[in-house]
């Protein structure tokens, strides 16, 4: 089975930002699997969150990115699975904390709430940050 660096999906509200992000990631030589949606026609965000979740669980990729209107619904839908730690990140600091303290495996972005000027910095920080373990591991065990 082919694996990817990142699996990504959006609803219709996040489609344009998703397209920009995919291009950015590919320029960084990262392999990206796009689960849709593939246009701005209205769709149901839980369907696309589930696609990324399933691909993470099936180990198609270790990291996922979801983009919705605000990202709230996407993060709720993704976090229904016990194997997923989806984090809605709005800036570099939240992206760093999501990985360092919570070992997040899905970055969630709100197309209408994230600053498009810093979205690449958010993604870079999320991808570069390693889980610190230690006391954070103990805390994660309490929510599994």
From Swiss-Prot:
Binding site for substrate: 12, 135
UniProt-listed InterPro entries: RpiB, RpiB_LacA_LacB, RpiB_LacA_LacB_sf
EC number: 5.3.1.-
Single GO term (MF): intramolecular oxidoreductase activity, interconverting aldoses and ketoses
Superkingdom per UniProt: Bacteria
Pfam families registered for this protein in UniProt: LacAB_rpiB
Keyword Iron appears in the UniProt entry: no
SUPFAM superfamilies: Ribose/Galactose isomerase RpiB/AlsB
Record's keyword terms, sorted: Isomerase
Active site: 101 (proton donor)
GO biological process: carbohydrate metabolic process
NCBIfam families (alphabetical): PRK05571.1 (NF004051), rpiB (TIGR01120), rpiB_lacA_lacB (TIGR00689)
Family of the protein in this entry: Belongs to the LacAB/RpiB family.
Name of the protein this chain belongs to: Putative sugar phosphate isomerase RBE_0278
Organism: Rickettsia bellii (strain RML369-C)
């Amino acid at each position: 089975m082919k694996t990817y660096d990142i699996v990504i999906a959006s609803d219709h509200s996040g489609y344009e930002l998703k397209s920009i992000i995919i291009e950015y990631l590919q320029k960084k030589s990262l392999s990206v699997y796009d689960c849709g949606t593939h246009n701005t026609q209205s769709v149901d965000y839980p369907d696309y969150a589930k696609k990324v979740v399933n691909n993470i669980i099936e180990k198609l990729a270790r990291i996922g990115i979801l983009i919705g209107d605000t990202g709230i619904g996407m993060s709720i839908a993704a976090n229904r699975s016990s194997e997923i730690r989806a984090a809605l990140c709005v800036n570099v600091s939240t992206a760093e904390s999501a990985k360092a303290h919570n070992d997040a495996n899905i970055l969630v972005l709100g197309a209408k709430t994230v600053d498009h000027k810093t979205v690449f910095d958010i993604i870079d920080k999320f991808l570069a940050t390693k889980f610190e373990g230690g006391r954070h591991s103990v805390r994660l065990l309490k929510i599994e």
